[in-house]
A protein has these predicted regions:
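Alpha/beta-hydrolase-fold serine-hydrolase catalytic core, especially in secreted/extracellular enzymes
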Residues: 188-189, 200-203, 210-216, 222-288
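Serine-hydrolase catalytic core
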Residues: 126-129, 172-224
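Short, solvent-exposed loop/turn and secondary-structure capping segments
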Residues: 17-18, 32-37, 63-67, 123, ...
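Cap/lid segment of the alpha/beta-hydrolase catalytic domain
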Residues: 1-101, 105-107, 114
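Structural recognition of the beta-strand scaffold that forms the well-ordered cores
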Residues: 21-25, 51-55, 108-113, 133-137, ...
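Primarily recognizes the serine-hydrolase "nucleophile elbow" in alpha/beta-hydrolase
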Residues: 24-29, 93-149, 285-287
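Mobile cap/lid helix-loop segments that gate and shape the active-site cleft of serine hydrolases
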Residues: 29, 70-71, 78, 133, ...
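Short beta-to-alpha linker loops that shape the active-site pocket of alpha/beta-hydrolase fold enzymes
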Residues: 56-60, 140, 222-224
């Protein structure tokens, strides 16, 4: 199956310039807005100096497409994590092509993802060292909270899909995908903005990373479904995602006093830029 991507550059890009890159992904039909879930704004990011790779993941494997039921399809797709491996392979090819244009700084790349795209983020952080920062609109497929947060019927459902939970061989099964099991090697700042209807599914990951001093931040949005629908929340997600990537990839902040508490937290995180390195969006130093 095929996949494709669009590379969006800043409107004032000139040949020879290199820009930090943000991946926006899951599906892309060529209408470049904010990716699946519409949470990471492509054109505003480009307008702030980012290269943005809008990536459309490949469809299911040939084995999965011959399935005659949803359960059979998902089990085939999950066998040896074949779907995750295929998506990662396609993403890496798209990134190679983007870097070959000469417009991307390969040492400053971030990834975002929502729903299945969040799982793509997980896999990429564990199985590659391509990215320096991540943003997720939902979190996370892992061993403990994910199968239990929605109750026993959901636990039975994910087991029927081929996942292993609370049984012999669980850790071996989850090793390539579990952020919990890979906390010692995943050292990337992670922003999570999720609805109150499903945030419990990632609490095991969030507690593990917080307890270990990793750079992680969770926002829970009230009265939200899987796809966020409230205009105020959608605007806040747009702004926070943009500022998160600017902070970690550009050493740049929004110097509006209303943002001071946000940047105080972020500056105290592991690996954060120092105050000497930070500049306001208008280019002014924070120092006198």
């Amino acid at each position: 199956s095929e996949s494709f991507a669009d590379l969006v550059l800043p409107p004032d890009h000139r040949p020879g310039q290199q820009h930090p890159l943000v991946v926006v992904q899951y599906t892309s039909d060529g209408f470049l807005r904010g990716g699946t879930g519409d949470e990471v704004p492509i054109h505003p990011l480009a307008n702030r100096g980012f290269a943005v790779l809008s990536f459309d993941r490949p469809t299911f494997s040939a084995a999965a497409l011959t399935a005659t039921s949803e359960e059979e399809l998902v089990r085939a797709n999950r066998a040896d994590w074949i779907d995750r491996r295929r998506v990662q392979s396609s993403l890496e090819i798209a990134l190679e092509l983007a870097i070959e244009t000469g417009a991307v700084d390969a040492g400053r790349m971030g990834i975002s993802g929502f729903s299945d795209g969040g799982s793509t983020v997980q896999w990429a952080l564990i199985n590659s060292d391509l990215f320096q920062v991540a943003s997720m609109g939902s979190c996370c497929e892992d061993m403990y909270s994910y199968p239990t947060a929605a109750g026993p019927r959901f636990t039975d459902f994910v087991r029927a899909m081929g996942y292993r939970h609370f049984e012999p061989g669980t850790e071996e099964f989850w090793r390539p995908m579990s952020l919990i099991l890979n906390v010692d090697t995943v050292d990337v700042p992670i922003l999570i903005q999720t609805g109150d209807s499903e945030y419990e599914g990632g609490l095991d990951v969030i507690e593990t990373y917080s307890h270990r001093g990793r750079a992680i931040e969770l926002y829970v949005l009230e009265n939200e479904t899987h796809v966020k629908w409230q205009p105020a929340h959608r605007q806040a997600i747009y702004e926070r995602s943009t500022e998160w990537f600017e902070f970690w990839l550009m050493n740049r902040i929004n110097c509006d006093p209303a943002r001071a508490q946000q940047y105080r937290r972020w500056s105290e995180m592991e690996g954060a830029p120092s105050s000497e390195e930070l500049q306001c969006f208008d280019g002014q130093s924070l120092l006198p």
